[in-house]
């Protein structure tokens, strides 16, 4: 796959970022290089290789799933423009 300036401009538009026109050609070359590396990764023979997520065995301690108020509801509600009974008060948005 090869990217040109028009494709870079379209990607920038979709990502809602501004890329100056004079940088689009350079960015297209960089993205083409990255895509080349990704294509090379696709050529690697991984048959028989077990997937791993980490090279360190990790086990997480389990804890009880208990609902709490976090210990400081007053501080949390203090950030709200308006609150009532430890809850944020917001305008009604659905009729």
From Swiss-Prot:
Biological process according to GO: glutaminyl-tRNAGln biosynthesis via transamidation; regulation of translational fidelity; translation
The UniProt record lists the keyword GTP-binding: no
Matching SUPFAM superfamilies: Glu-tRNAGln amidotransferase C subunit
MF terms (GO), sorted A to Z: asparaginyl-tRNA synthase (glutamine-hydrolyzing) activity; ATP binding; glutaminyl-tRNA synthase (glutamine-hydrolyzing) activity
Function: Allows the formation of correctly charged Asn-tRNA(Asn) or Gln-tRNA(Gln) through the transamidation of misacylated Asp-tRNA(Asn) or Glu-tRNA(Gln) in organisms which lack either or both of asparaginyl-tRNA or glutaminyl-tRNA synthetases. The reaction takes place in the presence of glutamine and ATP through an activated phospho-Asp-tRNA(Asn) or phospho-Glu-tRNA(Gln).
Catalytically driven reaction(s): L-glutamyl-tRNA(Gln) + L-glutamine + ATP + H2O = L-glutaminyl-tRNA(Gln) + L-glutamate + ADP + phosphate + H(+); L-aspartyl-tRNA(Asn) + L-glutamine + ATP + H2O = L-asparaginyl-tRNA(Asn) + L-glutamate + ADP + phosphate + 2 H(+)
A matching Pfam family: GatC
UniProt KW keywords: ATP-binding, Ligase, Nucleotide-binding, Protein biosynthesis
Family membership: Belongs to the GatC family.
Protein name: Aspartyl/glutamyl-tRNA(Asn/Gln) amidotransferase subunit C
InterPro entries: Asp/Glu-ADT_sf_sub_c, GatC
Description of how the protein assembles with itself and partners: Heterotrimer of A, B and C subunits.
Source organism of this protein record: Rhodospirillum centenum (strain ATCC 51521 / SW)
Class of enzymatic activity (EC top level): ligase
Domain of life, per lineage: Bacteria
EC number(s) per entry: 6.3.5.-
HAMAP family in the record: GatC
């Amino acid at each position: 796959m090869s990217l040109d300036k028009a494709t870079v401009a379209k990607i920038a538009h979709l990502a809602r970022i501004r890329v100056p026109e004079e940088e689009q050609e350079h960015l297209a070359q960089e993205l083409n290089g990255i895509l080349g590396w990704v294509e090379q990764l696709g050529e690697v023979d991984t048959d028989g290789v077990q997937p791993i997520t980490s090279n360190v065995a990790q086990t997480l301690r389990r804890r009880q799933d208990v609902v709490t108020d976090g210990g400081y509801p007053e501080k949390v509600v203090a950030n709200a423009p308006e609150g009532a009974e430890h809850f944020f008060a917001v305008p009604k948005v659905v009729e």
